Amino acid sequence: MALEFTDANFQQVVMESDKLSVIDFWAEWCGPCRAIGPVIEELATQYEGKVNIGKVNVDVNPNLSMNFGITSIPAILFVKGGQVVDKQIGAVPKAVLDKKIQAHL
């Protein structure tokens, strides 16, 4: 199951982690966000224990969105060692995200 990243836990769970983190910035009112939601859940199950995969609701956690300059959603950031190493804007097939994850493991 995908994690829920928030303003409160993001620093510890993502930025201070040695693992790759995949963060899906989304909102309930966003159609493409809802479309990619099941893909994020599948990847979270597939990479459980190896990669931190989770979601940030931009309406509930606006500080994270501002800090990362998120202006379009869904936006998926790949963070490793406290740095953004890749990103994907818009809904894409699972294979695209899987390839990006593999590239940064």
Predicted regions and their residues:
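Conserved residues in the N-terminal Rossmann fold of short-chain dehydrogenase/reductase
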Residues: 55
